From Swiss-Prot:
Record's protein name: Fructose-1,6-bisphosphatase class 1
Binding site for Mg(2+) 2: D112, D115, E283
Upper taxonomic lineage: Bacteria, Pseudomonadati, Pseudomonadota, Gammaproteobacteria, Pseudomonadales
Natural source organism: Pseudomonas savastanoi pv. phaseolicola (strain 1448A / Race 6) (Pseudomonas syringae pv. phaseolicola (strain 1448A / Race 6))
Catalysis performed (reactions): beta-D-fructose 1,6-bisphosphate + H2O = beta-D-fructose 6-phosphate + phosphate
Subcellular location: Cytoplasm
UniProt xrefs under Pfam families: FBPase, FBPase_C
EC number(s) given by UniProt: 3.1.3.11
InterPro entries membership: FBPase_C_dom (IPR044015), FBPase_class-1 (IPR000146), FBPase_N (IPR033391), FBPtase (IPR028343)
Record text on cofactor binding: Binds 2 magnesium ions per subunit.
Cofactor: Mg(2+)
């Protein structure tokens, strides 16, 4: 039986589910960019890509060399194809305008070019997260210049989302709104090959992922919930839990998608003005879309993340996502 490549899968989606051809081409371009990023990451010290740039992004975070390289790869790969009206990235203050010399398309691409970049220098997993939205009609008609407002759509408006994880294997995990598929990069073929046909998250779990070093800063409902997890069989949840933490959302969520679990990055008291650490548009929304399509759930502790109306490109939110039973329990504690 022949193997199903990403290209073949997308063509079949165009035939059977009426996936627009432009969306298919866009996903293929993003996948090619991810292959290039994977190659750059794998070179490590041999490619002179380790270390920091000495600059900060809009988040106030020190930029790693590979942050900047990955951002440029995604911009250059996607700006000329005619599928996009614009792009937005964690590494850029403002929306990226498609240069006038290139045709414009009907979609918007939002991405974190290299999630978990603090892991680069220690050779731990990192990844690329992306989200695809339709561009509002008023910006397509040229009546309005593209600006940040075009991107400020709730996660329910996503038409596709996914991530690439660069670890022992490079994988692309994708949803077009009809389940979740996983593709593994065959380096001999140079193609992503379908290896995980229908990714599903178990409803219950015995694993959770959270940065325990922040415990003293958490709100009371989070303290209560995590203490119950740690209490194990003797506690109110009546079972033992294991904690895992990779310090890269893409790696922690990948584990949850493949074997279940709960990922938490709650708000804390260090910066009361910030409702969370993770960015809504290019981290929480695409990951929440994937998790829900895999049968899981995702909230900010109070409401479904995909229902949040964004107020800014770099808006932050608290995140609880993964196995439905545990997400619902953690969310219920916030409402008591």
């Amino acid at each position: 039986m022949s193997r199903v490549t990403l290209s073949r899968y997308l063509i079949e989606q165009t035939r059977s589910n009426n996936t627009p051809a432009d969306l298919r081409f866009l996903i293929e371009v993003v996948a090619r960019a991810c292959k290039e990023i994977s190659h750059a990451v794998s070179k490590g010290a041999l490619g002179g890509v380790l270390g920091s740039m000495g600059t900060e992004n809009v988040q106030g975070e020190v930029q790693k060399k590979l942050d900047v390289i990955s951002n440029e790869i995604l911009l250059e790969a996607n700006e000329w194809g005619g599928h996009l009206a614009g792009m937005a990235s964690e590494e850029m203050d403002n929306a990226y305008q498609i240069p006038g010399k290139y045709p414009k398309g009907a979609y918007l691409l939002v991405f974190d070019p290299l999630d978990g970049s603090s892991n680069i220098d220690i050779n731990a997993p990192v990844g690329t997260i992306f989200s695809v939205l339709r561009c509002p009609n008023e910006y397509l008609s040229q009546n309005e210049a593209l600006n940040e407002k075009a991107f400020l759509q709730p996660g329910t408006e996503q038409v596709a989302a996914g991530y690439a994880i660069y670890g022992p294997q490079t994988m692309l995990v994708l949803t077009l709104g009809d389940g979740v598929k996983g593709f593994t990069l065959d380096r001999e073929m140079g193609s992503f090959v379908l290896t995980h046909e229908d990714i599903k998250i178990p409803e219950s779990t015995q694993e959770f992922a959270i940065n325990m070093s922040n415990q003293r800063h958490w709100e009371a409902p989070v303290q209560r919930y995590v203490n119950e997890l740690l209490a194990g069989e003797e506690g109110p949840l009546k079972k033992n839990y294991n904690m895992r933490w990779v310090a890269a959302m893409v790696a922690d969520v990948h584990r949850i998608l493949t074997r279940g679990g709960l990922f938490m990055y709650p708000r804390d008291s260090r910066e009361p003005s910030k409702p969370g650490k993770l960015r809504l548009m290019y981290e929480a929304n695409p990951m929440s879309f994937l998790v829900e399509q895999a049968g899981g759930a995702s909230t900010d502790g109070h409401q479904r993340i995909l229902d949040i109306q964004p107020e800014g490109l770099h808006q932050r939110v608290a995140v609880y996502l993964g196995s439905k039973e545990e997400v619902e329990r953690a969310t219920a504690y916030h409402k008591e």
